[in-house]
A protein has these predicted regions:
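Acidic, proline/glycine-rich low-complexity IDRs
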Residues: 1-41, 86-168
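Amphipathic, interaction-prone secondary-structure segments
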Residues: 35-85
C-alpha cells in the first residue's frame, strides 16, 4: 500500500521511512491550533495519514491528527472506508484516542475545521504518544488501527460515544 500524508490540500507520498519521519515531524510542528478572528479554524488544523492501494481512487484507511505543540497534546482519529475485506468489528466504527488520565484543562484541540468544535479533553494524549501512534500506523503499511494507545468509538467531529451527551 502507498502512504499518503495530506495537509492544507497538499498530499505527499514519502518514498522512504526517513522521508516519512521528516514529514511526520514537520506535520506536527505545522499544525495550527488556533482560531481565526471569524471563529473559523485556519487551514492546517489537521493532518491526514492514509493508505491507498496502487490503482485505487480512494484511500482505504485513515489516521487524522490534531495537535497543539505549544501545550504538548494531540488527538488521533482512525477509521477505514469499510471496503472488503475491512468490514465488521472495529472496521464498523470511527475511533478516537482515549486518555485514561486526561489533562486537567481543555487543550482545545480542533475536531471540526468548519465549526468551532473541539475534542473532549479525555481524547487528548501527550505528543510523544501521538507521534508513536502516527509512526506505528505509517510503519505497519497495512492501515490497521494502531495498538499502542486506548481508543473509544466516536464521530469525525470529535464526539465520543461514551459520553452521556452523545446524540446519534
Amino acid at each position: 500500500m502507498i502512504l499518503e500524508i495530506s495537509m492544507e490540500g497538499i498530499t505527499k507520498y514519502p518514498a522512504s521511512w526517513h522521508e516519512a519521519e521528516v514529514m511526520i515531524a514537520e506535520a506536527i510542528a505545522a499544525i495550527s491550533p488556533g482560531e481565526s478572528s471569524a471563529g473559523r479554524h485556519p487551514k492546517g488544523s489537521h493532518v491526514w495519514f492514509s493508505f491507498i492501494e496502487p490503482g485505487a481512487t480512494h484511500s482505504c484507511a485513515y489516521l487524522s491528527i490534531a495537535a497543539n505543540e505549544a501545550i504538548g497534546f494531540g488527538v488521533a482519529t482512525w477509521w477505514t472506508n469499510n471496503l472488503p475485506p475491512r468490514v465488521g468489528g472495529i472496521y464498523d466504527y470511527m475511533w478516537i484516542s482515549d486518555n485514561p488520565t486526561p489533562p486537567d484543562f481543555d487543550p482545545r484541540l480542533v475536531s471540526d475545521t468548519h465549526y468551532p468544535l473541539y475534542h473532549d479533553p479525555a481524547s487528548a494524549i501527550p505528543l510523544p504518544r501521538l507521534r508513536a501512534v502516527i509512526e506505528e500506523f505509517c510503519r505497519c503499511r497495512t492501515g490497521e488501527r494502531p495498538e499502542s494507545i486506548s481508543w473509544v468509538t466516536g464521530e469525525l467531529n470529535g464526539q465520543r460515544h461514551d459520553r452521556p451527551d452523545f446524540d446519534v
